[in-house]
Amino acid sequence: MLLVLLSSLLFGVTELTTKNFEEEIKEGIVVVEYWAHWNTEYIVKDFIVLKNAKLGRVNICDNIDLQIRDYILVVPTIIFFENGKEYKRLEADFFELKTTKEELQKIIDDRLMINQEK
């Protein structure tokens, strides 16, 4: 768990809680990883290198209300928000989320492209 917190601090990932969640996701594209201290082996390591989005993590063990509100059934789960609204969700399969940094970045880039075309 300490490794998760240290990597988050070093790479600009905001630790999200009930107190700051709404404020942190209300503007722009925000990518949030929901994780649990009992499953740190499968946190999404490529998550911290994403560009053009704000990054946040929610420890569901400490923020059960956010887990319930966002209907998190398995960790890790990654939710992409834009201006406070969910637009994409990726959920783990048997506690492991199989994705690449390129796939994650493409979701962000595609959304930015759609916004530019408006």
Each predicted region: which residue ranges?
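Non-catalytic, surface beta->alpha helical segment in thiol-disulfide oxidoreductase systems
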Residues: 80-118
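Solvent-exposed loop/turn segments at secondary-structure junctions
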Residues: 37-40, 61-63, 86-87
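Active-site-proximal beta-strand/loop segments in catalytic clefts of secreted hydrolases
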Residues: 34-36, 58-61, 93
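Short gly/ser/thr-rich secondary-structure transition/capping motifs
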Residues: 13-17, 58-60
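Local sequence-structure signature of Cys/Sec-based thiol-disulfide redox active-site neighborhoods
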Residues: 15-51
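Structural micro-motif
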Residues: 69-82
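Hydrophobic h-region of N-terminal signal peptides that target proteins for export
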Residues: 4-12
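Mature extracytoplasmic domains of secretory-pathway proteins
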Residues: 45-71
